[in-house]
UniProtKB/Swiss-Prot annotation:
Subunit structure: Homooctamer. Dimer of tetramers.
Keywords, in A-Z order: Cytoplasm, Flavoprotein, FMN, Isomerase, Isoprene biosynthesis, Magnesium, Metal-binding, NADP
Keyword Metal-binding: yes
Domain of life: Archaea
Residues binding FMN, per UniProt: T65, G66, M67, T68, S96, N125, K192, T222, G273, V274, R275, A294, L295
Cellular component annotations (GO), alphabetically ordered: cytoplasm
A Pfam family reported for this protein in Swiss-Prot or TrEMBL: FMN_dh
Organism: Aeropyrum pernix (strain ATCC 700893 / DSM 11879 / JCM 9820 / NBRC 100138 / K1)
Family as reported in the entry's similarity comment: Belongs to the IPP isomerase type 2 family.
EC numbers, comma separated: 5.3.3.2
Binding annotation for substrate: R8, K9, S96, Q97, R98, Q160
GO molecular function: FMN binding; isopentenyl-diphosphate delta-isomerase activity; magnesium ion binding; NADPH binding; oxidoreductase activity
Record-given protein name: Isopentenyl-diphosphate delta-isomerase
Length: 375
């Protein structure tokens, strides 16, 4: 099992880089328009992107979300990405640490991130199915201690497990196990999806049990069902997802509105198809605390090295900064105060789910500011 887990991590990475692994469905972020202010009454140099985040602080509201680790050949990737996060003062997550729990010799592939980023906000990672199958607070703490993490992500991936040839589609009792982890982990627990999006009901349930940090990881970006179907074809698996691999799930923008409605005081990462600073600005204006990217960071690193990744993330950061400036705010959470228009499919989906877009944009976003450091 240990060798299988490690080998699968390397296979995932190779497929992410070489195959079309993104959903054909949209994030729906294109249905968010931030109203431009032609008389902003602030200078660009006045703008600060610094935020408080899940018990820590970031110089910019960006997260390189976890995707890799657990094989000797990918250690350098975690090291390089972490060094970029350290330089920019942003957060970074590692991929699932299950392989290193099974084989402690692989811990170095994850520990490399902390070695390269002694001051960065570092997020550990374990899968929800492993909690359901027997992992306890002990393994959660092991993952945290392995990399001296500031938080731990518990990732939800029922779709991926259902189509993974060697998957573990076991979720019975998982909510209670997540609640136990949130109470005893010693660091904040971030519950994250993996490309199919969180829902209003799930976030409300978990928030009531003590979880305050979420990553919506919505539909519209990297799709792990599609990745597992592609892997399965090579291995002769009969499992085919059909259109489900492109269109099953909650698009990122819709998932974000649902999560913020369910938990106004939560810290929420919007990931899933975020590819540039406008995507990040739209997501934050819609109520996210931070935007998450993974696939673009890894692909840029593998194609152009560390400097390419640094250039990409600096560009996203600058585009986000100019968006804050062009609405007349000096703090990034000022985007929550900026007038926005939610229209088209996103507005229709919100209404169908019982969320009035006007109430959301004009009332809920402002009320949520009460819970955050906006000085």
């Amino acid at each position: 099992m240990t060798g299988d887990t490690s080998a699968r991590k390397l296979e995932h990475l190779k497929m992410i880089v070489s195959s079309k692994v993104e959903s054909r469905e949209s994030t729906l972020l294109e249905y968010v328009r931030i109203v431009h202010n032609p008389t902003p009454e602030v200078n660009l140099g006045d703008v600060s992107l610094e935020i408080d985040f899940c018990g820590g602080r970031l110089r910019a509201p960006l997260v390189i979300t976890g995707m890799t680790g657990g094989h000797p050949d990918v250690e350098w990737i975690n090291r390089e990405l972490a060094s970029v996060a350290e330089e920019l003062g942003i957060a970074i997550g590692v991929g699932s640490q299950r392989a290193a729990i099974e084989d402690p010799s692989l811990a170095r592939t994850f520990r490399a991130a902390r070695e390269a980023a002694p001051n960065a906000f570092l997020i550990a990672n374990l899968g929800a199915p492993q909690l359901s199958l027997g992992y306890s607070v002990r393994e959660v703490r092991m993952a945290v201690e392995m990399i001296d993490a500031d938080a731990i992500a518990i990732h939800l991936n029922p779709g991926q497990e259902a189509y993974q040839p060697e998957g573990d589609p076991f979720y019975r009792g998982v909510v209670g196990k997540i609640a136990e982890a949130a109470e005893a982990a010693g660091v904040p627990v971030i519950v994250k999806e993996t490309g199919n999006g969180l829902s209003r009901e799930a976030v409300a349930q978990l928030r009531a049990l003590g979880v305050r940090c979420f990553d919506v990881a919505g539909l519209g970006g990297t799709n792990w069902i599609k990745i597992e179907v592609l892997r399965g074809r090579k291995a002769g698996s009969p499992l085919e997802a059909g259109p489900l691999q492109d269109f099953w799930g909650n698009p990122t923008a819709a998932a974000l509105m649902e999560a913020r409605t369910a938990a106004p005081d939560a810290y929420i990462i919007a990931s899933g198809g975020v590819r540039n600073g406008l995507d990040a600005a739209r997501a934050i204006a819609l109520g996210a605390d931070a935007a998450g990217v993974a696939l673009p960071a890894i692909r840029s690193l593998l194609s152009g090295g560390r400097q390419a990744t640094l250039k990409l993330l600096k560009a996203i950061e600058y585009q986000l900064k100019t968006a804050v400036y062009m609405v007349g705010e000096t703090r990034v959470r000022g985007l929550w105060r900026a007038p926005i228009v939610v229209w088209g499919r996103l507005a229709e989906e919100a209404e169908a789910r019982g969320i009035d877009p006007r109430w959301y944009t004009n009332t809920l976003r402002l009320e949520a500011l009460v819970y955050k450091d906006v000085k």
